[in-house]
């Protein structure tokens, strides 16, 4: 660029800016005129005019309004346990990178905890407070991160933060599954963001694809392994032949399971996540109370061995399906359930081992999609929290809000009796003539078709392992009740659903 071209470019761009920004250039007006006259009188005017036009298209540096750096976005953190402490560390260690990605610095201004007398390495003690309510009500707080969990006081604190104009990032699956509608409505009314990627499957990005990337598609099913504790237990039972109690104790020793493992092993944790996934996938509000739930505490080594014998593996699955059947309101029904199930070893979810999570999505246009990764732990969950934090911070800088809740449908949730799938039934029977015929008749009378039968054992008793074709859950339950009344049936040892192709 020639020395006479730069003033023209700057001079033309300055017309779009306020006069106080242009005043330093006023004394150069004669210089501008002289240079323009030079171009007019010079030979090759056409070429000069072309150069003049080209020059004016180059952008000048955007001036700052007052020459001062923009103030930081102030962050309040609720909770400083495994996840919260990792979030606090990342906010400090990655401060420069976060600044570059957002365009504004993030400043951690307070951390709400239950007790102040605990030592928390690497975090400024002056940040800690036990007054969470006062922290979220501060007028200078722009962003609130909630990682304390549970229903209360988390719900009240999030609502207060939203009402005071702060955007919120939460990892609270239990609260979202119970009363997410109230929180989303409050965020929309306040014109701020409520993000929750970390609430489901840890570091796996599944909420955003369902909420944004696939929003133009029709999702027909979401099937996931969304609890790392139970997946670790079932994987060890499969690969090492260990029993449930033994493997649970091992998981507790390694920190994969809590001292009270009920929420994990009885499926409560997975049910909350299933409710969130179903709400996102089907644009209809589903709560944890709508989710049918069974845990894995009754899964035996015999179940694991039986699954292996038919080329399957046992997993605790969160299953969300869009049905073709319609409810009374004309909306298509959805089925949302959590329970152990046998799936073929060829299924993508079958190879998910250890404490890992995975979510398998099927949609009308995109087809089959698989999301896989670590589903729990401080670092993976903190990664998801920070991802949301960057997004809501960018929205804050632009003065905008991201997508809100998309629950425009009111889809009825089908009861478990209406679910249609295959079943694996293990029976202890007397090894007498006609027993197989009587059992087959029992299945037929209740409209359940047998796909395969396998007999094990010799002597006075035998074990029959039956896999059915697809049938309604209600029909299968009636069949099991009838089987228990047969004289030749000693025991219905186990009943487990079979998912996947077959």
Model-derived regions: residue spans:
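N-terminal amphipathic/hydrophobic targeting modules at extreme N-termini
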Residues: 7-14, 64-65
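Substrate-binding/catalytic subdomain of NAD(P)-dependent oxidoreductase enzymes
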Residues: 237, 246-351, 356-358
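Rossmann-fold NAD(P)-binding glycine/threonine-rich loop
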Residues: 155-160, 173-210
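N-terminal glycine-/serine-/threonine-rich beta1-alpha1-beta2 phosphate-ribose binding loop
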Residues: 54-164
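Asparagine/serine/threonine-enriched low-complexity, disordered tracts
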Residues: 17-28, 32-35, 39-42
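Glycine-rich phosphate/pyrophosphate-binding beta-alpha loops
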Residues: 367-369, 373-379
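Oxidoreductase and adenylate-handling cofactor-binding alpha/beta cores
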Residues: 206-219, 233-242, 272-286, 388
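A conserved regulatory-domain signal marking ACT and ACT-like small-molecule sensing domains
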Residues: 384, 389-502
């Amino acid at each position: 660029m020639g020395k006479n071209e730069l003033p023209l470019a700057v001079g033309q761009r300055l017309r779009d800016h306020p006069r106080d920004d242009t005043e330093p250039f006023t004394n150069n007006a004669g210089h501008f005129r002289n240079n323009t006259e030079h171009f007019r009188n010079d030979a090759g005017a056409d070429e000069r005019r072309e150069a003049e036009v080209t020059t004016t298209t180059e952008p000048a540096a955007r001036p700052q309004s007052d020459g001062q750096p923009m103030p930081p976005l102030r962050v309040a953190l609720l909770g400083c346990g495994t996840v919260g402490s990792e979030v606090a560390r990342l906010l400090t260690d990655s401060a420069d990178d976060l600044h570059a990605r957002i365009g504004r610095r993030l400043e951690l201004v307070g951390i709400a905890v239950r007790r102040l007398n605990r030592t928390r390495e690497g975090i400024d003690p002056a940040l800690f407070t036990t007054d969470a309510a006062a922290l979220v009500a501060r007028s200078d707080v722009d962003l609130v991160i909630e990682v304390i969990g549970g229903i209360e006081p988390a719900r009240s604190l999030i609502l207060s933060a939203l009402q005071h104009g702060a955007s919120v990032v939460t990892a609270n699956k239990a609260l979202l599954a119970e009363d997410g509608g109230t929180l989303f409505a409050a965020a929309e009314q306040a014109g701020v963001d409520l993000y929750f990627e970390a609430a489901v499957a840890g570091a796996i990005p599944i909420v955003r694809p369902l909420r944004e990337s696939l929003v133009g598609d029709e999702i027909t099913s979401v099937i996931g392994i969304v609890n790392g504790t139970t997946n670790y237990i079932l994987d060890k039972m499969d690969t090492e032949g260990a029993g449930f109690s033994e493997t649970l104790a091992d998981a507790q020793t390694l920190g994969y399971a809590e001292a009270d493992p009920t929420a994990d092993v009885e499926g409560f944790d997975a049910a909350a996540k299933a409710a969130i996934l179903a709400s996102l996938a089907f644009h209809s509000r589903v709560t944890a109370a709508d989710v049918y739930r069974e845990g894995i505490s009754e899964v035996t080594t015999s179940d694991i061995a039986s699954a292996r014998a038919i080329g399957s593996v046992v997993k605790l699955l969160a299953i969300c399906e869009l049905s073709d059947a319609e409810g009374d309101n004309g909306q298509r029904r959805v089925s949302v359930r959590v329970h152990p199930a046998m799936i073929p070893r060829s299924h993508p979810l079958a190879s998910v081992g250890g404490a890992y999570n995975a979510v398998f999505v099927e949609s009308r246009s995109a087809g089959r999609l698989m999301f896989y990764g670590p589903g729990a732990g401080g670092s993976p969950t903190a990664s998801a929290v920070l991802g949301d934090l960057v997004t809501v911070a960018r929205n804050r800088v632009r003065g905008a809000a991201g997508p809100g809740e998309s629950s425009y449908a009111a889809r009825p949730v089908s009861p478990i009796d209406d679910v249609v799938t295959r079943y694996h039934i293990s029976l202890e029977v007397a090894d007498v003539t006609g027993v197989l015929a009587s059992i087959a008749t029992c299945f037929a009378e209740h409209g359940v078709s047998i796909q395969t039968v396998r007999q094990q054992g010799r002597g006075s008793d035998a074990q029959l392992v039956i896999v059915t074709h697809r049938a309604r859950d209600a029909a299968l339950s009636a069949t099991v009740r009838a089987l228990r009344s047969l004289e030749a049936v000693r025991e219905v040892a186990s009943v487990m659903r079979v998912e996947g192709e077959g």
